Amino acid sequence: MTRKYTKKSSGSTASTTNSTAEIVDLTTSTSSVGKKRKSPDEKAQPITKKALNSLTPVQSMFEKYKGKNIIKAIHYTYLYTYIFNVHLDDDETIGPEGIARFCSDIGLAPDSFEILVLAWTMNASKMGYFSKNEFSSGFEKLQCSDLSTLKKQLNSTSQKLKHDSTKFTDLYKYAFGFASEVESKKSVDLGTAAEMLKLLLPEGPHTTNFAAFLCTQPNKSINKDQWLCFLEFSRTVKADLSNYDDSEAWPLLLDQFSEWVQQEKRI
């Protein structure tokens, strides 16, 4: 909008040419009083991992669960934290004693298949120990509102795994590293391997014999290739070994096992 103000000259009422002072245009620009439009570079950018780390715990929680049921998310977060703190053995970890108490609370044995499934879901790195991050990650995936629901979920997941060969193979691979006590995770003690196989493949056609065979070996450990090949061996070779072919690319350990079974007449 333009407003015109007229200033009269001092001495006369006169004519248009000498009585009319300069006309001043005062223009109010909408761009000067309105909100400044942001340039494309100034528009809000997604929160990066670095920026997320600088947020407060509450801000981080809201960012993490953006678009989800935040009340439910907060409930789960506090539930996981509470359960973890109740079973702590030190400031950061639930150890063997804490896991024993935790298993007692949900009514499952520490050496049960269901607890192995829980460890797999948590991606726990060491047998007998759960870190806070592992614990919260596993519970978040399972989305359980109480310990009773957790037990039901573990039972259900365990049954499904037994009928899903792909996911079971993932669990079987995970179990090797989980059971390994060496830093490289390249081997597992024979006694531990035997017990883990009984847990994973209790009805396998060769599990009982192979566990017994391992206890007779001079070597003290089994490597990952031998471990993985035994799963394939269990799936493809008949209990009586009638279709076993020693010319195939089986590890030497499995050739020796086949000979041992026949010599010991354990078929």
Swiss-Prot record:
User: Per the record, a Pfam family?
Assistant: Cullin_binding
Biased composition, Low complexity: where in the chain? 8-21
Any one GO cellular component localisation term in the record: ubiquitin ligase complex
- Domain named DCUN1: residues: 75-262
Instruction: Give me the ranges of the annotated region Disordered.
Output: 1-48
Cite the GO molecular-function annotations of the record. Answer: cullin family protein binding; ubiquitin conjugating enzyme binding; ubiquitin-like protein binding
Give the UniProt record's GO annotations in the biological process aspect. Answer: protein neddylation
Q: Which protein is depicted?
A: DCN1-like protein 2
Q: Which organism is it from?
A: Dictyostelium discoideum (Social amoeba)
